[in-house]
Amino acid sequence: MEYRINQRTGDRISVLGFGTSYIAEAGERDAVAAIQRAYAGGINYYDLATAEGRTFPYFGAALGAVRKNVFYQIHFGADYTSGTYGWSTDGETIRRSIEWQLAQLKTDYIDYGFIHCIDEFSDWQEYQRNGAFDYLTRMKEQGVVKHIGLSSHTPSTIQRVLDEVSVDMLMFSVNPGYDYQKGDYAKGSVDERSAIYRRCEAEGIGISVMKPFSGGQLLDAAISPFGKALTQYQCIQYALDRPGVLTVLPGMSSVAQVEHLLGFFGATEAEKDYSMIGSFSPAEAVGKCVYCNHCKPCPMGIDIG
């Protein structure tokens, strides 16, 4: 496993994290086994924006005994009071959901408490007006929340929220399709998305990556916006090469999936090389750096790491 340091918090975070969007489908036994295999493999960062509330007791069972060794990214606005995911900006609803989540996780603190899914600036205004942000900041003041984060798909909204509030982590959708305006959540121009990476890097805000495979589209030539398939390892490397990125959070629901993704660290450079996207990227990508490092040192003077 490889780790990167969050410059604002000092946390040492695994570059491969654990996404939970569909883990509930696996059932408790398989889910717990997958989570424990991830932990054994060095994964220490877990996102808890999941489709089903029953995911939380799985994590309580799997990681309750080693809670101090892992980081939970928990979303203030993801409502599980009905048993399944719902989005809410109501402070009281969020309070009930968070208290339930903590009980199921067998913990009394949250490493990263996230302002959840703010895709329009009006969402942020509603989040403040309805008491959600007040509740989050109160939990931070009480020490229940250690650090505050923001999740969004929209670069222009991210910029405006970051102008108003200090956060230590940003959850952002990162993959070559979205970066070149291809896909359902491909929001913002190439330059707007690049500006987010650069701002986060400059200000020490860590980026945790959601949707690294564009919901599986990039892995299937038949539905890829490029007409060709990428591998999971190529997509992970692409995301890790963006400025500011600390960890990539693919969804996992089985031991086999976890082991395959952990195989990234034993893969050859050729297996992780995504430089070929330059041969089939959309027209708007022409002339834009994709940080593949193959022209290093950059003839245009871009810092490509």
Where in this protein do the model-derived segments appear?
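N-terminal binding-site loop/beta-alpha segment at the start of enzyme catalytic domains
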Residues: 1-76, 80, 141
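Conserved, mostly hydrophobic/aromatic
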Residues: 6, 18, 46, 59, ...
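Active-site mouth loops of central-metabolism enzymes
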Residues: 16-29, 76-95, 121-125, 220-229
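Active-site beta-loop-alpha junctions enriched in small/polar residues
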Residues: 21-23, 49-51, 75-79, 115-118, ...
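Glycine/proline-rich, positively charged
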Residues: 26-29, 36, 40, 86-208, ...
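Structured C-terminal cap/extension of enzyme domains
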Residues: 39, 43-44, 191-305
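Short catalytic-loop micro-motif centered on adjacent basic/acidic residues
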Residues: 44-50, 146-150, 247-249
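Short hydrophobic/aromatic-enriched beta-strand-loop microsegments
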Residues: 69-73, 166-175, 269-275
